[in-house]
Amino acid sequence: MDTNSVHSHNTEVAFDPLEVIDTHRLQEKWQEGWVSQTLCQVNDCVVRLGAGHGKFHWHKHDNEDEFFYVVEGRLIINLNERTVELGPQQGFTVPRGVIHCTEALERTVILMVEGSTVTPTGD
């Protein structure tokens, strides 16, 4: 993670099944850096909301794929051999074992879908 950024990863599920998920209310509390919150669990996966700007460190997930979906802003996903830039309503899957580094040059809001056993900061 960029050393100038604050980051927080809450892996506790925030919403139960049959409960309305209000992401706007969550985002109002988040001020700077990167913040992520596990919204819900769907079968063996979790859906996380992330918001912020800055650069996350290079990492990989040994056993789980990771799906990113941009709600607002722009997300850059750096891979060893290429860079992918996503805008609103675009998504991208990073397969398990692939080293990657995400970056947002402006405040960006993303949804992530990944296995419930994933470590958000990488293996």
Pin down the residues of each PLM region.
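A cytosolic small-molecule/anion-sensing beta-strand core signal
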Residues: 43, 71-72, 87-88, 106, ...
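Short glycine-/acidic-enriched loop or helix-start segments at secondary-structure transitions
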Residues: 79-80, 88, 104, 122
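Ligand-binding loop in jelly-roll beta-barrel domains
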Residues: 96-123
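Short acidic-glycine-tyrosine-enriched beta hairpin
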Residues: 80-96
